[in-house]
Amino acid sequence: MSLEGIGFGYRERAPYASNPAFSRGRLVPEPESPTRTPFQRDRDRIIHSTAFRRLKHKTQVFIAHEGDHYRTRLTHTIEVAQIARALARALRLDEDLAEAVALVHDFGHTPFGHTGEDALNERMKKFGGFDHNAQSLRIVTKLEHRYADFDGLNLSWETLEGLVKHNGPLLGPYAAHPDIPVPQPILDFNARYDLELSRFASLEAQCAAIADDIAYNAHDIDDGLRAGLLTLESLDEVPLAKRLLDIVRTRYPNLDPVRTGHELVRRQITIMVEDVIEEAQRRLASARPGTMEDVHNQPRALVGFSDAMRAEEKVLKRFLFKNLYFHESVVVRRHAADRIVQDLFDACFTDPSLMPDEWRLGCEALDKAALARRVADYLAGMTDNYAVREHRRLFDRTPDLA
């Protein structure tokens, strides 16, 4: 299948695509909708959830209140969903499932991005640790309180499987990170509802995973240029970026730097998306899966970058880590955010009455591990701004994040 014509008109679902007509169902059985597939209902529940709205005020790379035009978890999530749908459409997969997994993949992130997660994990080490992917699962299976008949969102098996395993199997010979223990919340849920942790997730989930990489690689460049932490000249160090910039400069020799940066970003997204489509088609032609089960039983992911693009992406990531994620101004804010999260955990763990009613009720009956998890759930749900306000209320000495 060539890239020409993709997205035009009706194209038959691939035999190895996830099929909502054969969904494995939900943990709590529900009547089917007469107007929406199970995966469409999952997507809609995710969009209408409280956790989805909170993403608006959670940091992607920069502290959220630094500027209105930088990415937040919400804008990043929407961008990932768009790319995931495009990939699924090109590969004749279920677009709604790919979108649902993309929309839910960052639910468990703490305030202040990975800095907040690291800080919370440090405090939770004695109590099973903290992992944002496991927290996403807790949110959609336990912590969202919207429906009369169940806690969580009661998502379909396929969406939950994609959420937990979109980056690869967690157990077995094909585990993505065999040296890292599977987070306890995932093991606990899996004991109730087997997500087949040793097998690969659906192709739709794999689309969401690679879409995440494509989105943040490109858009962190955009935000870095906007913040003045990166320059177009510095990006000439990255072979992929230099090739694309040379194309832009040749075609538009008098283009201003802002538009030049945007032209770079859009071309980078395009070239990565096209690479994934071509590579996935090559792997599918080689593996020849005939059913969804064949996809689950593969020894490797079938959706991903080509070897050449993966090598170029690694160079780009190294550049971003050196020049953006560990830029001095970002590191200073990271230290301040780390202090806020750890201070809040210590305070609420020592005195649970500092938490709102719905979180502190019943804390006196909890053992230390259960109390620590309750506090972690509370803190993980905070937005950046709420965490700053709570720290100021409790300590009146909040570090300056501006």
Swiss-Prot record:
Keyword Disulfide bond appears in the UniProt entry: no
Using the record's annotation, list all stretches that form the HD domain.
73-217
> Which portions of the sequence form the region Disordered?
20-39
Name the UniProt key words of this record, in alphabetical order. Answer: Hydrolase
Q: Which residues form a coiled coil?
A: none
Q: Which domain of life is it from?
A: Bacteria
Q: A Gene Ontology MF term for this entry?
A: triphosphoric monoester hydrolase activity
Q: Which SMART domains match?
A: HDc
Signal sequence bounds: none
PANTHER family with a match to the protein in the record: BIS(5'-NUCLEOSYL)-TETRAPHOSPHATASE, SYMMETRICAL, SLR1885 PROTEIN
Q: Which family does it belong to?
A: Belongs to the dGTPase family. Type 2 subfamily.
Q: What name appears for this protein in its UniProt entry? A: Deoxyguanosinetriphosphate triphosphohydrolase-like protein
Organism name: Brucella abortus (strain 2308)
> Which lineage?
Bacteria, Pseudomonadati, Pseudomonadota, Alphaproteobacteria, Hyphomicrobiales
